[in-house]
C-alpha cells in the first residue's frame, strides 16, 4: 500500500454536515472529530514500508557476499531458533519430540480435570452455600446498578451472615492489632493537644509529625493485607477503619497547622510520599474482552478513586489511552453503551480479512487500525502532552520483535515524545492478528518520524501483561489495582478462601470454597499445570510458532494487590475479534462495575491517605505546577538529599522508646538487632529513607499479604534495562 493509495482511501469518506453531526453524535463528545491528519498517517506508512537495516553484503571490495532476494508477494520467513539457541546431543534430539508430546498430552488431561473440578465446586456452592435467604440477598446484591445501592445490599448481606461481629472484634491473625490500637490512641491524643494550641501544642505538633512518619507507610502493621477485606462484603475491621480516619484527620491537621514551619511540612510530606508510595491501575490485554475495562474505569471514576497512574497492555492500552487523554468530565460522557458506535476496528468481512491474512500474514490492516485508534488517543498526542492535559500518567507495555531484546514501558518519562496511538498499536500487535509496527515520535516542528531507529514492536501481553516491577521502578508504585480479562488466565483464577469483598460464606468465613477436598484438588492441578509449563520452557521443548515463545503468556504474574476479574460469558470467546454492539457494551459496562464495587472500600481507604499526601506536596514550591502534579512529580522516588534533622532523630528515638516500652509491657514485642550502630545518622537506603518507627514495621512484617504463586518472568525481574537499543527520545 502506497502513500497515495492511503490518501485516496482517506479522502473517499463522505463529508458530514453540521446538521448530520448534531443528529448522529449519540451524545458523545468529539464523535465526528478527526483528530489525526493525513500527513501523520503517511509518515507512519513510510516507516512501515521502509527497508530494514541492510546486512553486510561484502567483506571487502574483492569478496562480495551474495544475498538471497525475496520474490515480491512472498511472506517474510518466520524467525526460528538460531544455532546458538539450539541444544545439541543425541539424547536430546531423540527424546525432544516424544517428551514434548507426552507433556502436552498430560497438560490437556490436567486441563480437562481442572474444568471438572471447578464444575464440582460450583455445584457444591450452589447446593450447600447459596440457598434460601442467602441466595435471595445475593441476587439482590448482583442486580444493583450503582455503588450506593450495592453498598446497602452488601451491608444487609453482612448483617444476615453475622459478619458485623467480626468487624467489631479487633483481634485477627493477619495484622498487628496491638500496634494499631496503640498508634490510634497516640494519634488521637497528640491531635487533641495540637488543636488546643499554646506551648504544649507546638511540641505536640512536632511529636504528631514524628508519629505520622512512622505509621504512614505501605501496609503498616499489616493493615493493607487483602485478608482484612476478604471476610466481609463491605468494609474491614472497625479498628483498621478507625486508624484510616484518624491518620487522615491528623494529616489534614498538619497540613493546615500554623505551629509548623513550611520547611517542616515539606520535609514531612516528601518523606511520607516516599514511604507510602503510589497507587497504579493496570489494565490487561484480552482482545475485545478488554472492553470490560470500561466498566471498571466507570466504577472507579464515579466514586472518585481512579488513580492518576494507569498502565495498559494490548486491548487494555486502548482503554488506558482513552482515559489518559480525557478529563473526568469528558470520560463521564464517553463511558456509555453508545461508545460502541465509535469502535469499528473489526468491521471487515470474512472475504476481506481472509485475503489480507493470506497476503500479509495478519488479519487486520495496520493503517485502518491507526485511523481508528487515533480517535481514542486524540490524534497524534504524545505521552507528555497527554500528561500535561489531564495530569494522568499513561504507561503502555511494548515488546520488541526480537525475542531477546528488553521490553519497554512507554510513558512520559521514558519516551515523552512518542505518539500514543503508535504505542497502542504496537502493544496490540499479536502475531497473526496484526503485524509488528514502528513506533512514531513527534519532532519539535510537529511532524512525525520513526522512533528507536525504526525497530518494530509487538504485543506487550506476550511477555509483560502487568508490568508491576517497571511501574515500581519509575513511579514508586507500591499498591496495584489490576483489571484482568485475559480468557486464558481468568479460567484459572480461584480464591479458595475468598477475595476482597467476596468472602467464603459457609462456616462463618473459615471454610473452604467447595470444601477442603475441592479446594485442595483445584490447587494441586493448577500448580502441576504451572510446573509442566516451566519444564517445557526451561528444557527448550516448545517450538516458536510465528516466531514467538508462547510459554510466556502463562508464566507471568497477572495479579496485583487488588485484582478485579470481570465475569465473562461463553459468547465473549465467539466475539473475541468482533466489534461490540450497544447491547454487548452495555452488559460489559455493567459487569465491569459489578466486579469493581466490592473492591472500592479497600481502594478508597488507600486513596484517602495518598491524596492528602499529594495535597501536601502541591504546597511545596518545588513541586507545585500548573496541573495536579509538577512536571517531575516523582522526584522523591530517588531523592537522597533530604537528611533528617538531629533534633528530629532525638524526638524519634524518645518516642520510639516509649512505644516499644508499651509493647514490651503487653508482651507483643521481641527485641531485634538494629541495622545501624548507636548514634549513626539515618540515611536513605536504595532511594527510600528508613522511617522513624522502622522497628514497629519490622515486627509487624511477619503478617504478609497473599502472594501470587506464579514465578515472574525475566522481563518482570528486569523491567527496564537502560533502553540500550535507542528506545529513548531526546
Curated annotation (Swiss-Prot):
Subcellular localization, as worded in the UniProt entry: Membrane
Any single biological process term in GO: lipid catabolic process
Placement of sequence motif GXSXG: 312-316
Function text: Probable lipid hydrolase.
CDD domains tied to this protein: Pat_PLPL (cd07232)
Protein name: Patatin-like phospholipase domain-containing protein CIMG_04897
Domain of life: Eukaryota
Active site (UniProt): 314 (nucleophile), 459 (proton acceptor)
Keywords: Hydrolase, Lipid degradation, Lipid metabolism, Membrane, Transmembrane, Transmembrane helix
Residues annotated as signal peptide: none
Family: Belongs to the PLPL family.
EC numbers: 3.1.1.-
Predominant place of localization: membrane
Membrane topology: Single-pass membrane protein
Transmembrane regions listed in the UniProt entry: 97-117
Start and end residues of each stretch annotated as Disordered: 1-26, 667-730
Enzyme category, top tier: hydrolase
Ranges annotated as biased composition (Basic residues): 1-11
Sequence ranges of Polar residues compositional bias: 721-730
Gene3D superfamilies (alphabetical): Cytosolic phospholipase A2 catalytic domain
Residue intervals of the PNPLA domain: 281-472
Pfam annotation, one family: DUF3336
GO cellular component: membrane
One function term, GO molecular function aspect: triacylglycerol lipase activity
